[in-house]
Amino acid sequence: RKIALRKRPKTGLLAGLWEYPNVEGALDETAAGAAVEAMGLSVIDWQSRLTAKHIFTHVEWRMTGYALTVRGDGPAELEWVDAAGLAARSVPSAFARYYEEAKRELEMK
């Protein structure tokens, strides 16, 4: 089992940290599936849908995350990591709920 991460840009909010692949906007499952396919991945299975909110001093993020099983490697910017790889990367606390879920999934055998 592996999970996809990508490094955020070197400038801006959460610069240089790691994040889960994402797109801006409110997406339902159909739109989320289309976004995944636009990355060159095929959705095999949908496992879960998690919502989260993170408040920065100047902006509020409301997020919906989908846990998927996919086929393909996707764009070169994606790095597929196991549990040790996830633990070795700096993922912002804004994604804490998703980090814990990813960690739990990766540690399951």
What are these regions (language model features)?
Residues 1-109:
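Intrinsically disordered, low-complexity, charged terminal extensions of DNA damage-control enzymes
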